[in-house]
Amino acid sequence: MKIILSPAKKMIVDTDNLAPVELPVYIDKTAEVLNWMKSKSKEELKAIWKCNDKIAEQNFNRLENMDLYNRLTPAVLAYEGIAFQYMAPSVFEIQQFEYLQNHLRILSAFYGIVKPMDGVIPYRLEMQAKVGIGDAKNLYEYWRDLLYRSVIDDSRIIINLASKEYSKCIEKYLTPQDRYITIVFCELSGDKLVTKGTYAKMARGEMVRFIAENNIENPVEIQKFDRLGYSFRSDLSSDAEYVFERKIK
């Protein structure tokens, strides 16, 4: 069983704690992406990054000195978005790190795919960015089916905790033999169930933590998730979609 998760824009360097285990599997293709980005002007990159002048300047300077092989941080500690804050890997025990290394895969526009203990550096790039490298018109074409092939294992079970921007990298290549389960977090707004971005990100991280702490191998066990006020709605769920509703007090 594999769990897929989106990356986060906010990243840090932490070389004082856990050391990375290895480099991301597609580091050579990452080097191609980096070279392509270095060939662009600051204004071109600002348009790609969709950011203000200050953030563009910061990332442009970082890009010029970027080293894919030194001063690396384990991916699960490098990303600092909401999902990773609620996953709280910094307080994991060894068993949880081992579980995540075997089961969690973080999808990335820059690296393609990373294991939790792969060494990464801070970068800014989203999968839907207008980036054409070689014959590829965009990053979805650039990474092709490589992400899917890295995620699928003998169990053929994938738990989708990623956003649509990233999960579509996998969904395009699914086969009838695969069991792909999307996790939906929602709450009642008026008379409708809606997904609220911040709460969904919190829940995704909390669920990764729950799965790791309970060493889950059977997807049915995920239905027991009951943190942050969420509970499983069997009446709204299916084999391909597990729906969790947050009760608002």
Language-model-derived ranges and their functions:
Residues 4-91:
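Active-site helix-to-loop segments that bind/position phosphate- or nucleotide-bearing substrates
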Residues 2-6, 157-160:
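Short hydrophobic beta-strand segments
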Residues 88-239, 243-249:
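Internal, well-folded beta-alpha domain core
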